[in-house]
Amino acid sequence: MTKLQPSWPTPLVESEPRLTQYYRFALSNQYTSAGTHTVNYGNARGGGIVAFNRIEVDLLPPGYIQHHTAAADGFGDTTALMKFRIASANAEHGNYILTALLGHTFASSPKNGAATDSWNPVLAGGIGFLHHFNVESALGGIMPTGKIAQQGRSILWNSLVQDHVTPHVFLELENNATFYFASSHDGKLQNFVTPGAFYIYKRKEWKPTEPFLVFGSGIQIATSGFHTYNHNTILEMRILF
């Protein structure tokens, strides 16, 4: 795929426009607006495979959620995702990408998941410039299949800039915005700034056909008056193949 698209690392939070074959091991550690501590082992990450150079299919198994309160711990919901690469070019031919994504979350957890299934359409893209910078943006929504008055709907708009500092290190700064409609959060905005970093590990004699590792970390910091959580630390290890 390196001949067809850019070679940036997958963002910590924002939807990834590139097509990749991977598995992500992740953990998130956050504090709710009430000050309670929640850990998500898995963080709704999983794996994906690429087919026909334009399609990616992902399966995101449920993470295990530990509340550190009287709330019941347990697994969350499962999500399936499909991507279609609309247009792209590698660094030698424009360094850009535009991709459509469609996810479906299955309400599989009565205590730690959503009340109903939901659809998640997203349009994501990015472009590189000045040899070592790239900017990306993704606009999408969460549309439950029922119980709208209870769950509401939301629009997600994420943007970022990445800097390829060294052959092995990328730095990232994301902005993650969620606009709420209906439910008790109707009309509210939740916004985070997310600084992050990635270390790419490849063996000394690595070839493009061989797998490699990416280690990532970052923290979501609330910048809006309304937020359901804050100081969300994210740790990841990825295997790309």
Please annotate each region the language model reported.
Residues 1-241:
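Transmembrane beta-barrel domains of Gram-negative outer membranes and organellar outer membranes
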